[in-house]
UniProtKB/Swiss-Prot annotation:
Its cofactor is Mg(2+). One of its GO terms (biological process) is viral genome replication. The modification Phosphoserine is found at S67, S154, S156, S164, S166. It comes from Rotavirus A (strain RVA/Human/Japan/AU-1/1982/G3P3[9]) (RV-A). This is Non-structural protein 5.
Length: 198
């Protein structure tokens, strides 16, 4: 599977990406001015330009190329356009003069072993603090634990109930009756205070 992109408005670079090939480096760099400057022009570029301009495109043969490869020379012949001496050799001809197959076309091939692999790691952390401190003064804390003190020796008749409220007559007129009812009333008040605190 290959992807070819030809941009005619820019310096005509088309790229083909081939998958599952043996080489992972750039295998071929050929074609127009970029390829010519690396493969076809001899160290004396000016002399080579004048030599190529002196011949018509039909007269260019394999011996005129830096390579004797027939496909390379065919690519030179099919893309050569005669220009003035100042512009040098131009291979920027129209697309119609190129061969129909990809072989010999102006292209930059990138051969990849396993295609393109993109690995991205996104690390993120979210910290939410829900600690709410309730400020309590020591005085409030102590006042909640302060319960009313009831004297067991109180002479108040409010703590003394009739015999029907006693434990089925088990505590009739005993000497601990007043202390018992005082303790029971205190326990009720403690229970009521606990309920209010909750």
């Amino acid at each position: 599977m290959s992807l070819s992109i030809d941009v005619t408005s820019l310096p005509s670079i088309s790229s083909s990406i081939y998958k599952n090939e043996s080489s992972s480096t750039t295998s071929t760099l050929s074609g127009k001015s970029i390829g010519r400057s690396e493969q076809y022009i001899s160290p004396d570029a000016e002399a080579f330009s004048k030599y190529m301009l002196s011949k018509s495109p039909e007269d260019i043969g394999p011996s005129d190329s830096a390579s004797n490869d027939p496909l390379t020379s065919f690519s030179i012949r099919s893309n050569a356009v005669k220009t003035n001496a100042d512009a040098g050799v131009s291979m920027d001809s129209l697309t119609q003069s190129r061969p129909s197959s990809n072989v010999g076309c102006d292209q930059v091939d990138f051969s990849l072993n396993k295609g393109i692999k993109v690995s991205a790691n996104l690390d993120s952390s979210v910290s939410i603090s829900t600690n709410v401190k309730k400020e309590k003064s020591k005085n409030d804390h102590r006042s909640r634990k302060h319960y009313p003190k009831i004297e067991a020796e109180s002479d108040s008749d409010d703590y003394v109930l009739d015999d029907s409220d006693s434990d089925d007559g088990k505590c009739k007129n005993c000497k601990y009756k007043r202390k018992y009812f005082a303790l029971r009333m205190r326990m009720k008040q403690v229970a009521m205070q606990l309920i209010e605190d909750l």
